[in-house]
Amino acid sequence: MKKHLFPLILLACSLVACDNGFKVESGFTLVPLESQITTVQPMTGLVMWTTHSQRLRYAPVIQLEFQYCLPCRVVTGKADGKIQYDWSYFEQVLDDMKSRNHQGVIRFRYEYPGNTLVDGEPGSTAVPQYIKELEDYNETFKKNEDGPTYYADWTNKELQWFTKQFYTDFAERYNNDPRIAFLELGFGHWSEYHIYGTPLKLGTNFPSHDYQKEFLTHVDQVLDIPWAISIDAADSYYTPIVKDEQLMALNFGLFDDSFMHEHHEIAQGDGYNERCWQEIGRNTRWHTGVCGGEISYYTNYDQRNFLDTAGMYGWTWEEAAAKYHITFMIANDATGSIHGSTERFREAGIASGYNFQVVNCRTNGEETRFTVNNIGVAPIYRDAYFQINGTQSEVSLRGLLPGNSLDITIPTGLTKSEELTIVSPHILPTQKIEYEATSNELVK
């Protein structure tokens, strides 16, 4: 204890009393900041599909758009052991979102029951054509209740190799592209970790448990973009994840594509969704892995009423977002509904993800110190930094949990609110991370 006594004495001597009982360092003065959070923050909020007819009307109150993408659209073949790509289709998708000042939530998939986008035939897989032409590649077919569906052949070694290599190449090209906010990954129908309605044959129409572990471990190593898998991956029949501590330690997030349906919660009856969140989320996954999804389509009622301020099925959106620490949520069919005004979209978006608050800001003209609180419901999952007139803090806001705070020091003076901003290499130049600051008094 003696070795700490002298620094403590110096610290005590460097403080002077304030009327409110707090202390401010000698030579430092409080900086009166006035700043408000007025809109949805980048990489958070309600999400619309890129093809939505009202995407321009709602553009100012959302930050994200969703798009399924097809590997077969960007892969042209393989030569000399390397996959050949033409990314022009995908670049067009990203640039289209960017034109509306939005980032993408991207999901690559192989199977989509009944969908005709690949070649006009219902249910065709999005497996690259060069693989489909291999003699030892044989897809299976099922007239699934969700639509006719062809299934990728997971006995094929080339498909297994390609699926891993694709994300290696994707990461090399797009890891630091600010047009992409999040990735959703998976296998089966819509990449949602199931093939409900079709008999499961692990290693044939769905990847084996061993390959799933190999794949998930690989993407965790190569991807810097925050990525999520379906809560359906909690099912140990389909996946090995919840019974494998190495897999549970990976930095994946979760998406729930039937969020807020009538029996979502255990207390509401079935509770399948909540149980999945508990089993694969363990109440802490959201600390490092982004959480999102899509409002339920179990009935047409759900999407059109979840924004009711009086609540739906006993829950308001704000309560559900806080409970599950939601950062983004697809709400395509809420637009134009009685509860889905642009203002309500803005309110709901602000109620998701991170929100920062600055308190105790003081400066001596050469150095500025303040505390930042996260007053949102989730952390920010990519690096972001405070800066003053171009001088940047060395402390990232990434991972700052709700209710927690960081002390920030920037080696330059501050005279007004406009000089203090938040920057990130992972948002578009047209986007801005706001913060709340309405007090020039020291607070706890």
Model-identified regions with their sequence ranges:
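Bacterial Sec-dependent N-terminal signal peptides
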Residues: 1-3, 8-10, 15-29
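N-terminal substrate-binding region of glycoside hydrolase catalytic domains
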Residues: 24-158, 284-322, 326-340
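Extracellular/luminal regions of secreted and cell-surface proteins that mediate adhesion/ECM remodeling
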Residues: 350-444
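Long, well-ordered mid-to-C-terminal structural blocks that present hydrophobic/aromatic surfaces
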Residues: 321-372
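Catalytic-core regions of glycoside hydrolase
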Residues: 27-52, 98, 182-192, 196-335
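Active-site groove signature of glycoside hydrolases
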Residues: 137-159, 163-203
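Alpha-helical packing segments of well-folded alpha/beta enzyme cores
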Residues: 89, 93, 162-166, 170, ...
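Conserved, mostly hydrophobic/aromatic
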Residues: 65, 97, 170, 183, ...
